[in-house]
Amino acid sequence: MLLDVTLIVLCAGNSTRFEHKTKKQWIRIENEPLWLNVTKRLASFSQFDKIIVASHEDELAYMKNFTDDFTFVKGGDTRQKSILNCLEFVTTKYVMISDVARACIPQSVIKNLLDEKENADCIVPVLNVTDTVIYETNTINRDEVKLI
């Protein structure tokens, strides 16, 4: 059963904070580029009506060689512009957006978000922090910090 949900995966960035000569989306996981691995993994979690991948303009044609299962859209020069470009191709009532760098999202998080989709205008996952958190020189109580 389709859920009236479009999945958008953002991978149009230049990976400037990544500080590596290869863009994040092209790092390999199990012999696949990260963007393909993450998108296929997320797609396997639910029956999305459509899956849209935002790509850098220079990489669009190459990405299309990997699969016909997704709609590829030219990303913008900011995350917000990439989202806007993708939204032009959405025909469903609901949209789920993920960044390609979120390769390890548990299926339970996706399921919980989809289960709650009709209960709010916008839903984001709020995850507990398990690492030590330091702000300036002070260790912060990790129970007071959340990952979004």
Language-model regions, residue ranges each:
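N-terminal glycine-rich phosphate-binding loop and ensuing alpha1 helix
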Residues: L2-E57
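Residue-level signal for inorganic ion chemistry
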Residues: V9, W35, C86, S98-D99, ...
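Short amphipathic alpha-helical segments
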Residues: H20-K23, K40, K64-F66, S108-I110
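Conserved beta-strand scaffold positions in the cores of enzyme catalytic domains, especially
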Residues: W26, F72, C122-I123
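Conserved N-terminal catalytic core of the sugar/cofactor nucleotidyltransferase
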Residues: L34-T92
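Acidic metal-phosphate-binding loop of nucleotide-sugar-dependent transferases
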Residues: R79, V100-C104
